[in-house]
Amino acid sequence: MSKIFVFGHQNPDSDAIGSSYGYAYLKRQLGVEAEAVALGTPNEETAFVLDYFSVNAPRVVESAQSEGVNQVILTDHNEFQQSISDIKDVEVIEVVDHHRVANFETANPLMMRLEPVGSASSIVYRMFKENNVEIPKDVAGLLLSGLISDTLLLKSPTTHASDPAVAEELARLAGVNLEEYGLAMLKAGTNLSSKSAEELIDIDAKTFELNGNQVRVAQVNTVDISDVLSRQAEIEEAINSSIKSNGYSDFVLMITDILNSNSEILALGSNTDKIEKAFNFVLENNHAFLKGAVSRKKQVVPQLTESFNV
């Protein structure tokens, strides 16, 4: 069998990198020639993780076929618009994910492992256990980081009942204190001062097709929402430019306070009435407070989907 690429979504976060790194390692242990690659450079949080566990960043690829690869495994995503550029021209043989299934179709049967847990890394951990393969320290560290990132250290409503035990076991294998390491990791991802507005709105952004509309939903983590809002003018300029160049109908930016577990929603586009209806708030100067919201997957995208489909 020729080489298989394993990768997470575009604009990769710690779970996209961690789950693909871990699953590629597991596949190699099971005799498959698999390489973890990335669809973008690591963000600051993930760079902290890679440095902490002395792991080289996976190489960034633009397409699979240009690398002579025709079979791929997706982790932490399944929607084609979030995947590699030539996704429709290669064979997807496996998916390991914890998101909704949408805009996904294959010509052949495949293995899909979908679970409503806190992270794709949580699923990969279970697959190690099921195959009786030991998890080395670096893999444990990256899987743990993916889980911490996606659940905001187990505080997000996306946290599954099984996730705390998974986190404790991975922390033990990685040789770290869960709380101390988790907080340091999350804080590393809140350093936004060096980011341009264009970079800031693309750190962690995904496009969703909602009733024929291409809606971009981005998220940045911070310890002070006002710091981000102080740059509102340049952020809005970057958003409007992105809307125009990419054909988005709307752009929603979640500015998430990781210490107090709240978000400010900044929204621009042609369907702001639907965005207001989704969250039962009124945008003032294009933004509004959303108490208790920290999860794009559970507290933003489903609400937008329902509102746009009415």
Swiss-Prot record:
Enzyme nomenclature, EC number: 3.6.1.1
Gene Ontology CC annotations of this record: cytoplasm
Keyword Ribonucleoprotein: no
Enzyme class (EC, first level): hydrolase
Manner of cofactor binding, per the entry note: Binds 2 manganese ions per subunit.
InterPro entries with a match to the protein in the record: DDH_dom, DHH_sf, DHHA2, DHHA2_dom_sf, Mn-dep_inorganic_PyrPase, Oligoribo/pAp-PDE_c-di-AMP_PDE
This protein's UniProt keywords: Cytoplasm, Hydrolase, Manganese, Metal-binding
Entry keyword Cytoplasm: yes
Alphabetized Gene3D superfamilies for the sequence: DHHA2 domain, inorganic pyrophosphatase (n-terminal core)
Location in or out of the cell: Cytoplasm
Catalytic activity: diphosphate + H2O = 2 phosphate + H(+)
Entries under PANTHER family matching the protein: BIFUNCTIONAL OLIGORIBONUCLEASE AND PAP PHOSPHATASE NRNA
The name this protein goes by in its record: Probable manganese-dependent inorganic pyrophosphatase
Organism: Streptococcus thermophilus (strain ATCC BAA-250 / LMG 18311)
